[in-house]
Amino acid sequence: MRLALGIRYNGQAYEGWQSQRSGRTVQDKLEAALAKFAAQPIGTLCAGRTDAGVHALMQVVHFDTTVEREPFSWMRGTNRFLPDDIAVQWAQPVPDEFHCRASALARRYLYVLSQSPVRPSLDSGRVGWSMHPLDGDAMRAAAALLVGKHDFSSFRASACQARSPVKDLRRIEITRVGSGDRCRWHFEFEADAFLHHMIRNLMGCLVRIGRGDERPEWITEVLEARSRKVAAPTFSANGLYFLGPLYDAKWGLPAEATLQAGGAPYDGPP
C-alpha cells in the first residue's frame, strides 16, 4: 500500500528536511515516529527538500508499507510520536503510480518579511526582516520581469544538483500587510520547480530593489548574466515557508494539495 501524508512543521530547530547523520532533520523525526507507530522501518520521499530554518505549511510525502491502518489512525498515531513543532495534517491512500515529487504539477513558497526599525522578537525565526522601508511598486515591477520560463543560473546555489537551471516561474505576488514604517510583506512564488536557494536569492534582489539600491530593470541584467556573482547575497531562511506542491485532482488528495483548488492558504504570522 502507498500512503501520502501532508506535513506541517516549524523548521527553526532542524537542519532542513533531508536525513543527516546528526538526526536533527524533519525527515529523521518523521521516519522515527512512523517506525514507532507501524512497528517497522519506513522510508519516506518528499515533494520539496527544505533547507535549515525553512518552514512548511504543506509538505507532502509518500511511502510504501504492508501495515494496514485507517488514514485517521496514521495521522493520529504518527503525531503521538512527533515533537510539537512537526504535525501530520492528513493521511491518504494513493495509487502506486503516485509520486509526491514527480506527480507534482507546481510548487508554491511564501516569504514573510517584517519591515520595522526594530528586529522581530516574538516572531523571531518565523519572519525575515528589513529595517529599511520598501517600495512595493518597484518590487512588483521587477517581479513581473522574472515571471516566465528562464535560465535562473544567477539565482542558483553552487551546491544545486538540479539537471537544468531552466524553470517556469509562473507567478510572483507581493502584498503589503499594514501601513507605516512597521508592516509585513508577503512574497508568494509559484513555479514548476525551484532551484536550490532560488527563492532566497530572488528575495535578496527584490529587497535590494525595494530599498532603492537598484532600479527594477536591474533584475533583467542579473537574469541574463547567468552568474551568481552579479546577484544580491542570499537572503535569510527565517521567513521562508513551503506552501506545498499542487497535484491533479485525479489523485484524490485533500483540496489544499490540488491544483484545481488553488492549494493551501497561508495562516502563519500576519
UniProtKB/Swiss-Prot annotation:
The answer, when asked if Isomerase is one of the entry's keywords, is yes
- Which Pfam families did the record assign? PseudoU_synth_1
Described by its record, this protein's role is as follows: Formation of pseudouridine at positions 38, 39 and 40 in the anticodon stem and loop of transfer RNAs.
Q: Which GO terms describe its molecular function?
A: RNA binding; tRNA pseudouridine(38-40) synthase activity
What InterPro entries has UniProt attached to this entry? PsdUridine_synth_cat_dom_sf, PsdUridine_synth_TruA, PsdUridine_synth_TruA_a/b_dom, PsdUridine_synth_TruA_C, TruA/RsuA/RluB/E/F_N
The entry marks the following residues as binding substrate, namely: Y109
Any idea which residues are catalytic in this one? D51 (nucleophile)
Residues annotated as coiled-coil are none
Keywords annotated in UniProt: Isomerase, tRNA processing
The text of the family note is: Belongs to the tRNA pseudouridine synthase TruA family.
A GO BP term here is:
tRNA pseudouridine synthesis
Can you say what this protein is called? tRNA pseudouridine synthase A
Q: How does it assemble?
A: Homodimer.
Enzyme Commission number, as recorded: 5.4.99.12
UniProt catalytic activity? uridine(38/39/40) in tRNA = pseudouridine(38/39/40) in tRNA
PANTHER family given for it?
A: PSEUDOURIDYLATE SYNTHASE, TRNA PSEUDOURIDINE SYNTHASE-LIKE 1
Question: What organism is the protein native to?
Answer: Variovorax paradoxus (strain S110)
